[in-house]
């Protein structure tokens, strides 16, 4: 039976730009760019897991604002259910505690990065919601 993981990802937005993080060399899909986040642990809600992961990976205290979209993909023999959430408010300065580097860019610029495949549909959903004028 294939292992299934629930994973959360943050589309962190500030001043019209979103934060991308480059995966470290020791991780799956090394060097690809992604939205920061991680696995949902037993007993956690998705927003709780995201707050914890952003504290661990970036050193920020985030306020999870709104659900964006989900995507399912097989990665390294595991079925990943990836759920994106919008984060527009946080305290602290994001730092690359886990990732190689961080980069702020517009959502359109993000499409030019070598993104982790599972994150592309989430970015497209975010861009579509912005184009539809959904509230910020």
Map each language-model feature to its residues:
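Conserved Nudix-box catalytic region and its N-terminal flanking loop in Nudix hydrolases
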Residues: 17-56
């Amino acid at each position: 039976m294939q292992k299934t993981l629930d994973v959360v990802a943050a589309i962190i937005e500030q001043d019209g730009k979103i934060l991308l993080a480059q995966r470290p060399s020791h991780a799956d899909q090394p060097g690809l760019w992604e939205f920061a986040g991680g696995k949902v642990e037993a007993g956690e809600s998705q927003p709780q897991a995201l707050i914890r992961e952003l504290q661990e990976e970036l050193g920020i205290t985030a306020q999870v604002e709104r659900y964006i979209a989900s995507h399912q993909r097989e990665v390294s023999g595991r079925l990943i259910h990836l759920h994106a959430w919008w984060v527009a408010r946080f305290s602290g300065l994001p730092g690359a505690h886990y990732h190689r580097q961080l980069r702020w860019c517009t959502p359109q610029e993000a499409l030019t990065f070598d993104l982790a495949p599972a994150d592309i549909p989430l970015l497209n959903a975010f861009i579509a919601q912005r184009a539809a004028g959904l509230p910020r």
